[in-house]
Amino acid sequence: MKTLHLLLLISGLLSVFVKGVGSHPGTVHVRFKCIPKIAAVFGDNCPFYGNVDGLCNDKKSVCCMVPVRLDNI
């Protein structure tokens, strides 16, 4: 049940952040990065945390989802 809720959360976040297909200026994509759990506890600036299968499988890390605009790349 937790996995289902997590998948719904991630798909909801992706639908909010991914506003278009392709590389048009102003398009927002989501980047994933793994950070140590201790950094997450002590204030790493991450807007959304989650788990993604196959990414950040280490028990000592969490997955951070960061929205990125293509004009900032």
UniProtKB/Swiss-Prot annotation:
Pfam families: Defb50. Its main location: secreted. It is found in: Secreted. GO terms for biological process: defense response to bacterium. Keywords: Antibiotic, Antimicrobial, Defensin, Disulfide bond, Secreted, Signal. Residues 1-23 form the signal peptide. The keyword DNA repair does not apply. Disulfide bonds join C34-C63, C46-C64. The keyword Membrane does not apply. InterPro entries: Defb50 (IPR035193). One of its GO terms (cellular component) is extracellular region. Has bactericidal activity. Belongs to the beta-defensin family. This is Beta-defensin 50. It comes from Rattus norvegicus (Rat). The gene is Defb50.
